[in-house]
Each structure stands twice: as C-alpha cells, then as structure tokens.
C-alpha cells in the first residue's frame, strides 16, 4: 500500500474500510430524489360545457339541445293564417357519473428510516396522478368522436399529416357552424412527433404564425406552438400513438361536456390502525364526460416520420 492511499484504500486494513461494510468511506446518496419526466395536464382545459341549472343529484346528468325550426320562405296569405308547426323533441346528451380515485400508503417505519422525505413525495405523486388520470378520461371521451380523417387516405401508421388535412377539417367545422375557441380559430391538440411533420412540410410558409403574433401571452395555452389554416396548435405527448397511429384532435366550442358530483381532490385518509402507523393519502372524485356537440369535433389519424 502506497503512502498516498494508506488511509483510504478500501482493499486493505485502512481507516477508509470497505464500501458497504465497516469503514469511514461509503457510498453517498443524494437526498433529493427526482420525479419522472412528466407531461403537463392539458386536455381538461378544453371542457367548456357543464350543467348550468342541475335539478338534483343523480348518477346520470342529462343535457338537452333544442332543434331549430325549419326555414320559412313562403309569402303569407293576407287572410289565411299559417298552420302552427310543432317543435321537434330536443336532442339529449347523457353524462354518466363514475367514482374515480387512487390511494397510496405511508408508514411510520418508512418515514423514520427513509433518507428522503416520504410524505412530501407521496403528496406530489398523488396530485400529479389526479391530474394525469382526469386528463386521460377526457382524452378517452374525445376519441369517441365519429368525425375522422385518415392522413394519406389509409388507416395505418404510414400516412403523415399534411396541410390539406388541416384545411379539410377546418372547412368541415365551419360548415358545421362550430364556433371557434380563439376568435374564429379552432383548438388543435397534436403530438410533438406529428407536429414535426406538419411544420416540416410547411417550413417557410407565411401562413404558419407564431403564437405571439395573434394572441396576448396571458391567453396562451400551455404548449401552444402556433396557428395554421384556421386552427391554433397545442403540443402534448398525451396524444400518444396506438399501434403507431396518432390522434390529432380539432374542436370548437362545446365539443365536450363534463358533469361533476365531487370535484377530484387530494384526500388525507384517517389513521385507524391500533398503533397509528399507517397514513393513507389519495385522490377521489365523481365525474363524467361525453361529447356534447359532435359537429364541433374532428380528428386526424396519422403516423409520424419520426415515430419510435
């Protein structure tokens, strides 16, 4: 053993000792334990239709939409009054409320022996899981929409989104009389992989506008990357692919409805075990989602040139 490492050599009988056994030199751990990379909650922000005058609590909340009267273009007779026209039955949208939640558990032993703070980490994990789970419920409801365009004319992952797809859907939404969500522009949720293809195809196109050129920064959606052909695009990895096919969702006002009996919230459970060692924390809510105006909802299904 050289004089240089006589006190720290971990393979000899030194004061440093052996890592993992006796000795003063051991592995060090950073007490700050990082969380996984996370996507930001996004999709629930587009819900803009909720019950306004709910009559009573119930397991299903029914919303109704009047049907307009037919146009009249005939001239009235001077003497004979027109026949009264019966008004059609309103359309009905049913929102089924379901109970949702998740629970995690901390113990006195875990908190006492852990090198990192456990309770704060569990609170963070539960709060994110709440937002993440509710956003997935919203996405599942949006994917029930019946208006679908397949990029490239196919139904697999080979076609990539193009400007013509955006123009087609914006035209259809306007033809359906769907109201825009930012002036006359429609909201478009897009995965970054798909956004890459659309922006690469239209690089240098003056019709692609950066967000700051059409809206005050205070009114930007999280992840908003620009507007193009009548829609403003918001990137989110939450719009992930299934079997290589990504959904890009376009919607106007009142595309999706939400009813809430209990707003999802974090719950600190009661400590009920005899020695008060187990401390539950979770989230709980009762809510439901459904498409309210299918005419205000479209999606493009496409692959991506940079998909994994």
Language model: regions and residue ranges:
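Short helix/loop capping segments that flank catalytic or ligand/cofactor-binding pockets
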Residues: 71-74, 105, 114, 197-201, ...
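Sequence/fold signature of self-assembling virion shell proteins
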Residues: 2-47, 160-167, 200-308
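Alpha-helical scaffold segments that mediate packing/assembly in large oligomeric complexes
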Residues: 110-179, 299-308
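Extended, solvent-exposed, turn-rich assembly/linker loops in the middle of proteins
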Residues: 146-221
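Hydrophobic alpha-helical segments involved in membrane association or supramolecular assembly
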Residues: 63, 188, 277-281
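Structured loops at beta-to-helix junctions and adjacent beta-edge loops in soluble globular domains
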Residues: 56, 64-67, 107, 191-193, ...
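Long, hydrophobic/aromatic-enriched structural stretches that serve as scaffold segments
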Residues: 82-128, 132
